[in-house]
């Protein structure tokens, strides 16, 4: 095995600490070519699609990418921001905010972000850390709930990059924070602030709040993945924080792909059923997405909205994701700080002179 080239070891190295925020990824542009390139990497991950790769790659290259590339590009174009992809824009802002928060609290750490698929990739970010003298790294996935298809594959990519290093840094990982009080508080604050500006649903009249999480195949639950249970845990804690019952608030799962059974209830059919049942207002919030992206802006804000209205609903609200909310940045900083304990994150103080 060939190892990456590295500078000579030195006792005068920076011995710095790096915090790497890791998100899923996004195409570089809302074009069919860029989207196909992104989807090819994403859907080729055996953690994401757990069927024999020899069969899957034929289907992927001959049917799925040609069909989905152009259709998905149109959807990305509908949500693209002047600065770029929403997921990348919001993740960059979160990174800047966490860096500023830690620095203002006396932490001497580098903070950067990487994407599991697309750019900037995890290997590049870890290489940049090494070049800056980082010897300890905290991997912080932006997925509050653990899943093999998100958290585990992000760690896989990081460990693959480490396997190519001769002089490896010390590494810690944040597995999940689905029940972390600061995260739950940030979610509740996001909902409350939205309602303060746009009015609270009339739950007594039958209005609903839907908590929509990204779906995964049901068989992953049967195989031991804790994702479903952690989504339900987050949902229950958020309902309690908002003072809502399971009649007023429902946990659902979105973004089903293929014909296999996924975690249920599905988001879009649930919203249509609400409309058909006479529910006048439905608010949808996505607690598992820490930054707005195609799945929240387009799928929820457009497709799911249309399902609800087509079913007879009158008013639909998509509550924005945490993005750069101050409570969320504070929660991120708190979770990071907890996982940095024991590492020399602050400059040594000189001994007092007697």
Curated annotation (Swiss-Prot):
Alphabetical UniProt keywords: Cytoplasm, Heme biosynthesis, Iron, Lyase, Metal-binding, Porphyrin biosynthesis
MF terms in GO: ferrochelatase activity; metal ion binding
Pathway: Porphyrin-containing compound metabolism; protoheme biosynthesis; protoheme from protoporphyrin-IX: step 1/1
Enzyme class label: lyase
Disulfide bonds: none
InterPro entries: Ferrochelatase, Ferrochelatase_AS, Ferrochelatase_C, Ferrochelatase_N
Binding site for Fe cation: 214, 295
GO cellular component terms listed in the entry, alphabetical order: cytoplasm
Name assigned to this protein: Ferrochelatase
Organism: Burkholderia orbicola (strain MC0-3)
Phylogenetic classification of the source organism: Bacteria, Pseudomonadati, Pseudomonadota, Betaproteobacteria, Burkholderiales
Gene from which this protein is expressed: hemH
């Amino acid at each position: 095995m060939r190892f990456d080239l590295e500078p000579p070891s030195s006792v005068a190295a920076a011995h710095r600490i790096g915090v790497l925020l890791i998100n899923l990824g996004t195409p570089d542009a809302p074009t069919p070519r860029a989207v196909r390139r992104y989807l090819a990497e994403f859907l080729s991950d055996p953690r994401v699609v757990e069927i024999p790769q020899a069969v899957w790659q034929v289907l992927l290259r001959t049917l799925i990418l040609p069909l989905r590339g152009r259709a998905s590009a149109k959807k990305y174009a509908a949500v693209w921001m002047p600065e770029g992809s929403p997921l990348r824009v919001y993740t960059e802002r979160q990174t800047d905010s966490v860096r500023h928060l830690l620095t203002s609290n006396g932490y001497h750490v580098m903070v950067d972000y990487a994407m599991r698929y697309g750019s900037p990739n995890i290997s590049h970010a870890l290489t940049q850390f090494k070049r800056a003298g980082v010897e300890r790294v905290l991997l912080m996935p932006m997925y509050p709930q653990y899943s093999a298809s998100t958290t585990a594959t992000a760690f896989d990519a990081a460990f693959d990059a480490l396997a190519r290093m001769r002089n490896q840094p010390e590494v810690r990982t944040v597995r999940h924070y689905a029940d972390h009080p600061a995260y739950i508080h940030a979610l509740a604050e996001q909902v409350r602030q939205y309602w303060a500006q746009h009015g609270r649903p009339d739950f007594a009249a039958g209005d609903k709040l839907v908590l929509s999480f990204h779906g995964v195949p049901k068989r992953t639950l049967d195989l031991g993945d804790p994702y479903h249970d952690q989504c339900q845990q987050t949902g229950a804690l958020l309902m309690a924080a908002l003072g809502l019952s399971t009649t007023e608030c429902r946990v659902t799962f979105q973004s089903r792909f293929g014909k296999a059974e996924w975690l249920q209830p599905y988001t879009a059919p649930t919203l249509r059923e609400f409309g058909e049942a006479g529910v006048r207002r439905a608010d949808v919030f996505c607690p598992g997405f820490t930054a707005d992206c195609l799945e929240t802006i387009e799928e929820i804000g457009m497709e799911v909205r249309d399902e609800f209205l087509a079913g007879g609903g009158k008013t639909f609200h998509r509550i924005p994701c945490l993005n750069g909310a101050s409570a969320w940045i504070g929660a991120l900083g708190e979770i990071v700080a907890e996982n940095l304990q024991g590492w020399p994150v602050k400059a040594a103080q000189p001994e007092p002179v007697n």
